[in-house]
């Protein structure tokens, strides 16, 4: 007796389903799910896989997204605790990690996350040996180094979300001050994602007009308009959002989808993201920091050589020394 499906549909060929544009997200917390919805709404993948250790939450998030399939153009959304669901991914985004406990030192948090990465990374490598790794978990620069060391991947394929969001926050705040859309406000925040990031004031411009040329005090303590406060707001903004709602999610999710788009579509756009910076700016250690990188289908193919002031370069070097101080203590 023919089934309803057989009566309705005549099959013409036996297909083997191998995804061409698969994206995996590891960790289905607030950040992971914000990445997932942002990626789904940009139609970047033909399959999205979610992985986590919390099975009920994982299944619930998967089902909730699947129920929105009519409104999306991603035909397959899967999940599992077992990494076999991640097979054949082009891009794997890692948002999983331990949350900082009150009073916990950053070094202790890092070591806890290293232990988590020691489980995650080999599983990803096993099922998607040719993927790009995009690390979002904090502290992102150190964990990108950890992912690079554990994976054995070439450095172009291990990317940290870095200062992509810091720079976006900066451009938003700059736009608010000037009454101009952030897309038309240009400015770069480089270095370590977080407290010691470096705003490159010399490059801040609208329509190619340098703000520093118009207003030489820009970004200095002598500045009557206190533009330096804009960078301080960028540094403090995550803490403020966490204090108000408990975590950050939407902006980082959108920022990650922006990076995913450059990779999946081979756009070769320039982003301030974390890459192995050894050999640049007099840095001699294996540290990952954000510099402007050309991002495409092979990950980071090139970096843009930014002209920094002596102070800016010194800040970058200081960040590198701090990171190396932590990295050399890590137990793999």
Swiss-Prot record:
Catalytic reaction(s) noted: (S)-lactate + NAD(+) = pyruvate + NADH + H(+)
Major site of localization recorded for this protein: cytoplasm
Question: Where does the UniProt annotation locate this protein?
Answer: Cytoplasm
Task: Mark the residues carrying the PTM N-acetylalanine.
Answer: 2
Pathway(s) this gene product operates in, as recorded in its UniProt entry: Fermentation; pyruvate fermentation to lactate; (S)-lactate from pyruvate: step 1/1
Query: Which InterPro entries does the record cross-reference, listed alphabetically?
Result: L-lactate/malate_DH (IPR001557), L-lactate_DH (IPR011304), L-lactate_DH_AS (IPR018177), Lactate/malate_DH_C (IPR022383), Lactate/malate_DH_N (IPR001236), Lactate_DH/Glyco_Ohase_4_C (IPR015955), NAD(P)-bd_dom_sf (IPR036291)
State where substrate binds: 106, 138, 169, 248
Q: Which residues bind NAD(+)?
A: 29-57, 138
Q: Which residues form the active site?
A: 193 (proton acceptor)
Kindly provide the name given to this protein in its UniProt entry. Answer: L-lactate dehydrogenase A chain
Protein's organism: Bos taurus (Bovine)
High-level lineage? Eukaryota, Metazoa, Chordata, Craniata, Vertebrata
């Amino acid at each position: 007796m023919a089934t309803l499906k057989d009566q309705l549909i005549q099959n013409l060929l036996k297909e083997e389903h191998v995804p061409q544009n698969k994206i995996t997200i590891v960790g289905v917390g607030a950040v992971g799910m914000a990445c997932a919805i942002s990626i789904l709404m940009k139609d970047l993948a033909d399959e999205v896989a979610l992985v986590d250790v919390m099975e009920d939450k994982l299944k619930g998030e998967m089902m909730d997204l699947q129920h929105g399939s009519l409104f999306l153009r991603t035909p397959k959304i899967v999940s599992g605790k077992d990494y076999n669901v991640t097979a054949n991914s082009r891009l794997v985004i890692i948002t999983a990690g331990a949350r900082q406990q009150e009073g916990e030192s950053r070094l202790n948090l890092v070591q806890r996350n290293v232990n988590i990465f020691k489980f995650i990374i080999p599983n990803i490598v096993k099922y998607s040996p040719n993927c790009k790794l995009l690390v979002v978990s904090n502290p992102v620069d150190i964990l990108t180094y950890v992912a690079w060391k554990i994976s054995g991947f070439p450095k172009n394929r291990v990317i940290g979300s870095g200062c992509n969001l810091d720079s976006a926050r900066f451009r938003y705040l700059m736009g608010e001050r000037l009454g101009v859309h952030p897309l038309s406000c240009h400015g770069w925040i480089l270095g370590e994602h977080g407290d010691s990031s470096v705003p490159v004031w010399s490059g801040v411009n609208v329509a190619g007009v340098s703000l520093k040329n118009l207003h030489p005090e820009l970004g200095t303590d002598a500045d009557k308009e206190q533009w330096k406060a804009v960078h301080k707001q960028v540094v403090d903004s995550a803490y403020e959002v966490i204090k108000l709602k408990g975590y950050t999610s939407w902006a980082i999710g959108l920022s990650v989808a922006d990076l995913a788009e450059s990779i999946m579509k081979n756009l070769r756009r320039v982003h301030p993201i974390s890459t192995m910076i050894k050999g640049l700016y007099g840095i001699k250690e294996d540290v990952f920091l954000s510099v402007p990188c050309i991002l495409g289908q092979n990950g980071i193919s090139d970096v843009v050589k930014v002209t920094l002031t002596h102070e800016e370069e010194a800040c970058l070097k200081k960040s590198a020394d701090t990171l190396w101080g932590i990295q050399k203590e890590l137990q793999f």
